[in-house]
Amino acid sequence: MRLYLCEKPSQGKDIAAVLGAKTRGDGCLRGPGVVVTWGIGHLLETAPPGAYGDHLKNWSLDTLPILPAQWKVIVKPKTASQFKVVKQLLKEATELVIATDADREGEMIARELIEYCGYRGPIQRLWLSALNEASIRQAFSSVKQGAETYPLYLSALARSRADWLIGMNFSRLFTLLGRQAGYTGVLSVGRVQTPTLRLVVDRDREIANFIPKPFWNLDVQLCTAGHSFLAKWVADESVTDDEGRCLDQSAATAALNALQNSQMATAISVETERARDSAPLPFDLSTLQEVCSAKFGLGVQETLDVAQALYETHKATTYPRTDCGYLPESMLDEVPMVLDAINRTDPTIGKALLLIDPEQRS
């Protein structure tokens, strides 16, 4: 039996539909010779310090640092029933296809189950960038060998264990030091959250301590040989700050008066630069969140929820959490349909759409 292991139920249903696996089972879908099952995100998690000994259940400086010699994982209680399904199917499977999200976290979700359940059969990897039918069929035609993506699992595993080591050890350390100083709460420390908090605090302090200083710019529209251009007055260094801005109003006023009286100016420096702007790539998640926050006031999680729904439910976008900004070639055949939809939505850009080469590849 060939088992397809997906990351979430919605993903499993999309893949099962293409495979013809229509018979609903307990936590899976079955078809001729195939079974599609899924996790609900991670079904396993790294064990807490107490799992390595009763002496680590209580917080004490004497037990730090906690450095597991042999790492342990445990089944997440909330999804234990689905774990049992996956474990049993892995026992029955003669071959396995990992069909989780195409990133290192998706790789880890599958690989940690494979190791925990002791599956030793052949492994292939279905690399999906989108969940529309054409992309799924394209992925089926170019299935990878499991060894090709195994390093992604090692990367995710290193990240996970680094998070654990930093979070568990430093949270205990600073909480215990805080208690010695009279603080009774928990001081949470994290590999990502603590540096991010530092950036926010530093920026907040900069804003609080900022002393506004007025400065004066002088931009002049000049004309020579029938051509006009915008020139910028450069003040003497004695009256400018580190960014070259003039801090002396009288110097700026004097320069303005001199220009108005003479009607002549000399360009002392001319810079010419030839530049080529490439078309922007599709959004990655962080850029999408920045734009949605600035334009629509959406929070980070709200933007992620919308992006996930567009990917999983509506099949309108590609996988939102990928680091790659390029679309899969399997979607090239859909370009004319997408351009037509854009034209019908906003006919004012119809002429611009005619200039697009629908066959172009990056």
State the predicted function of each range.
Residues 149-156, 163-169, 175, 313-362:
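Extended, highly charged linker/hinge segments and catalytic-adjacent loops that couple domains
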